[in-house]
Curated annotation (Swiss-Prot):
In stage 6-14 egg chamber nurse cells and oocytes of adult females and spermatocyte cysts and bundles of maturing sperm of larval, pupal and adult males. Pfam families: DGCR6. InterPro entries: Gonadal. Belongs to the gonadal family. This is Gonadal protein gdl.
Amino acid sequence: MADIPATSEGSANTSEAVVEYQQPTPEFLQRKIYFLVDQLRTYHSELPENLQTRISYDLLTELANCVLNDGIFVIVKALMELQHETERHLIKIRMQAENEYEIEVAEWRSKIKDPEELRHILGLMKIKHTKKLHESDTKIIEILDQKVNDQQSTLQKAGVPGFYVTENPKEIKIQMFLLDFILRLSRLKYEPGK
Protein backbone atom coordinates (compact mmCIF):
# COMPACT_ATOMS: atom_id res chain seq x y z
CA MET A 1 0.00 0.00 0.00
CA ALA A 2 1.42 3.36 -1.00
CA ASP A 3 1.83 6.23 1.43
CA ILE A 4 -0.44 9.17 0.74
CA PRO A 5 1.33 12.48 1.18
CA ALA A 6 -0.40 14.92 3.48
CA THR A 7 -0.98 18.37 2.07
CA SER A 8 -1.98 21.51 3.82
CA GLU A 9 -3.61 23.19 0.83
CA GLY A 10 -7.19 22.58 2.04
CA SER A 11 -6.50 23.64 5.59
CA ALA A 12 -4.57 26.74 4.55
CA ASN A 13 -7.54 28.11 2.61
CA THR A 14 -10.12 27.36 5.26
CA SER A 15 -8.05 28.74 8.13
CA GLU A 16 -8.52 32.24 6.74
CA ALA A 17 -12.30 31.90 7.15
CA VAL A 18 -12.04 30.59 10.70
CA VAL A 19 -12.23 33.33 13.28
CA GLU A 20 -10.01 32.58 16.21
CA TYR A 21 -11.86 32.60 19.52
CA GLN A 22 -9.90 33.66 22.55
CA GLN A 23 -10.79 32.20 25.90
CA PRO A 24 -11.50 34.98 28.42
CA THR A 25 -8.80 35.39 31.03
CA PRO A 26 -9.56 34.64 34.69
CA GLU A 27 -9.04 38.34 35.42
CA PHE A 28 -11.63 39.31 32.78
CA LEU A 29 -14.13 36.78 34.18
CA GLN A 30 -13.57 38.02 37.73
CA ARG A 31 -14.18 41.63 36.70
CA LYS A 32 -17.30 40.59 34.81
CA ILE A 33 -18.61 38.74 37.88
CA TYR A 34 -18.03 41.85 40.00
CA PHE A 35 -19.90 43.90 37.39
CA LEU A 36 -22.80 41.42 37.31
CA VAL A 37 -23.01 41.16 41.11
CA ASP A 38 -23.01 44.96 41.34
CA GLN A 39 -25.88 45.16 38.84
CA LEU A 40 -27.79 42.42 40.66
CA ARG A 41 -27.37 44.22 43.99
CA THR A 42 -28.78 47.37 42.40
CA TYR A 43 -31.81 45.44 41.11
CA HIS A 44 -32.12 43.75 44.50
CA SER A 45 -32.18 47.11 46.31
CA GLU A 46 -35.17 48.17 44.18
CA LEU A 47 -37.30 45.32 45.57
CA PRO A 48 -39.66 45.75 48.51
CA GLU A 49 -37.84 45.01 51.77
CA ASN A 50 -39.81 41.83 52.49
CA LEU A 51 -38.58 40.39 49.17
CA GLN A 52 -35.00 41.59 49.67
CA THR A 53 -34.70 39.37 52.74
CA ARG A 54 -35.74 36.34 50.68
CA ILE A 55 -33.02 36.82 48.05
CA SER A 56 -29.58 36.51 49.63
CA TYR A 57 -26.35 38.03 48.36
CA ASP A 58 -25.04 34.48 48.02
CA LEU A 59 -27.88 33.74 45.61
CA LEU A 60 -27.06 36.91 43.65
CA THR A 61 -23.40 35.85 43.42
CA GLU A 62 -24.42 32.37 42.23
CA LEU A 63 -26.71 33.98 39.66
CA ALA A 64 -23.88 36.23 38.43
CA ASN A 65 -21.63 33.18 37.99
CA CYS A 66 -24.41 31.36 36.17
CA VAL A 67 -25.04 34.11 33.63
CA LEU A 68 -21.38 34.32 32.68
CA ASN A 69 -22.55 31.71 30.20
CA ASP A 70 -24.67 33.64 27.69
CA GLY A 71 -26.54 30.41 27.01
CA ILE A 72 -28.67 31.13 30.08
CA PHE A 73 -29.88 34.34 28.42
CA VAL A 74 -30.84 32.36 25.32
CA ILE A 75 -32.78 29.83 27.41
CA VAL A 76 -34.63 32.53 29.37
CA LYS A 77 -35.53 34.48 26.23
CA ALA A 78 -36.77 31.29 24.52
CA LEU A 79 -38.90 30.43 27.56
CA MET A 80 -40.29 33.96 27.59
CA GLU A 81 -41.23 33.74 23.91
CA LEU A 82 -42.93 30.38 24.47
CA GLN A 83 -44.83 31.89 27.38
CA HIS A 84 -46.02 34.81 25.25
CA GLU A 85 -47.05 32.49 22.42
CA THR A 86 -49.01 30.31 24.85
CA GLU A 87 -50.72 33.36 26.34
CA ARG A 88 -51.69 34.65 22.87
CA HIS A 89 -53.15 31.23 22.01
CA LEU A 90 -55.11 31.04 25.27
CA ILE A 91 -56.49 34.57 24.81
CA LYS A 92 -57.62 33.57 21.33
CA ILE A 93 -59.44 30.51 22.76
CA ARG A 94 -61.13 32.68 25.41
CA MET A 95 -62.21 35.26 22.83
CA GLN A 96 -63.56 32.50 20.59
CA ALA A 97 -65.81 31.29 23.43
CA GLU A 98 -67.07 34.86 23.94
CA ASN A 99 -67.72 35.32 20.21
CA GLU A 100 -69.61 32.02 19.95
CA TYR A 101 -71.92 33.18 22.74
CA GLU A 102 -72.56 36.54 21.04
CA ILE A 103 -73.33 34.81 17.72
CA GLU A 104 -75.71 32.38 19.42
CA VAL A 105 -77.50 35.25 21.21
CA ALA A 106 -77.89 37.12 17.91
CA GLU A 107 -79.32 34.01 16.24
CA TRP A 108 -81.91 33.53 19.00
CA ARG A 109 -82.86 37.20 18.92
CA SER A 110 -83.57 36.95 15.19
CA LYS A 111 -85.57 33.69 15.54
CA ILE A 112 -87.69 34.34 18.65
CA LYS A 113 -90.20 37.20 18.55
CA ASP A 114 -91.96 36.55 21.87
CA PRO A 115 -90.12 38.68 24.51
CA GLU A 116 -91.01 36.31 27.37
CA GLU A 117 -89.72 33.23 25.53
CA LEU A 118 -86.60 35.13 24.40
CA ARG A 119 -85.86 36.26 27.96
CA HIS A 120 -86.17 32.65 29.17
CA ILE A 121 -83.88 31.29 26.41
CA LEU A 122 -81.30 34.05 26.93
CA GLY A 123 -81.32 33.35 30.68
CA LEU A 124 -80.62 29.65 30.04
CA MET A 125 -77.92 30.58 27.53
CA LYS A 126 -76.29 32.92 30.06
CA ILE A 127 -76.12 30.09 32.62
CA LYS A 128 -74.67 27.73 29.99
CA HIS A 129 -72.20 30.38 28.83
CA THR A 130 -71.06 31.17 32.38
CA LYS A 131 -70.47 27.47 33.04
CA LYS A 132 -68.59 27.06 29.75
CA LEU A 133 -66.40 30.11 30.50
CA HIS A 134 -65.65 28.82 33.99
CA GLU A 135 -64.57 25.45 32.52
CA SER A 136 -62.50 27.25 29.88
CA ASP A 137 -60.85 29.50 32.47
CA THR A 138 -60.07 26.50 34.68
CA LYS A 139 -58.43 24.77 31.72
CA ILE A 140 -56.42 27.93 30.90
CA ILE A 141 -55.19 28.16 34.50
CA GLU A 142 -54.13 24.49 34.39
CA ILE A 143 -52.21 25.09 31.15
CA LEU A 144 -50.48 28.17 32.58
CA ASP A 145 -49.62 26.33 35.80
CA GLN A 146 -48.09 23.51 33.75
CA LYS A 147 -46.15 26.07 31.69
CA VAL A 148 -44.71 27.58 34.91
CA ASN A 149 -43.81 24.09 36.10
CA ASP A 150 -42.04 23.32 32.80
CA GLN A 151 -40.12 26.61 32.95
CA GLN A 152 -39.02 25.99 36.53
CA SER A 153 -37.83 22.50 35.60
CA THR A 154 -35.94 23.76 32.53
CA LEU A 155 -34.17 26.49 34.50
CA GLN A 156 -33.36 24.08 37.32
CA LYS A 157 -31.84 21.62 34.81
CA ALA A 158 -29.88 24.50 33.24
CA GLY A 159 -28.36 25.13 36.68
CA VAL A 160 -29.93 28.54 37.31
CA PRO A 161 -29.82 29.17 41.08
CA GLY A 162 -33.12 29.83 42.80
CA PHE A 163 -35.13 27.71 40.38
CA TYR A 164 -36.89 24.49 41.30
CA VAL A 165 -40.38 23.18 40.76
CA THR A 166 -42.79 24.71 43.28
CA GLU A 167 -46.41 25.78 43.47
CA ASN A 168 -45.79 28.11 46.41
CA PRO A 169 -46.91 31.59 45.23
CA LYS A 170 -44.24 33.35 47.33
CA GLU A 171 -41.46 31.23 45.84
CA ILE A 172 -42.84 31.73 42.32
CA LYS A 173 -42.83 35.49 42.91
CA ILE A 174 -39.15 35.33 43.91
CA GLN A 175 -38.41 33.31 40.77
CA MET A 176 -40.21 35.93 38.68
CA PHE A 177 -37.95 38.63 40.10
CA LEU A 178 -34.89 36.47 39.40
CA LEU A 179 -36.08 36.08 35.80
CA ASP A 180 -36.51 39.84 35.58
CA PHE A 181 -32.94 40.28 36.85
CA ILE A 182 -31.65 37.85 34.20
CA LEU A 183 -33.53 39.63 31.42
CA ARG A 184 -32.22 43.01 32.56
CA LEU A 185 -28.66 41.66 32.65
CA SER A 186 -29.09 40.24 29.14
CA ARG A 187 -29.61 43.78 27.83
CA LEU A 188 -26.36 45.04 29.34
CA LYS A 189 -23.04 45.02 27.58
CA TYR A 190 -20.03 44.44 29.80
CA GLU A 191 -17.15 46.62 28.69
CA PRO A 192 -13.95 46.04 30.67
CA GLY A 193 -12.08 49.15 31.63
CA LYS A 194 -15.18 51.29 32.11
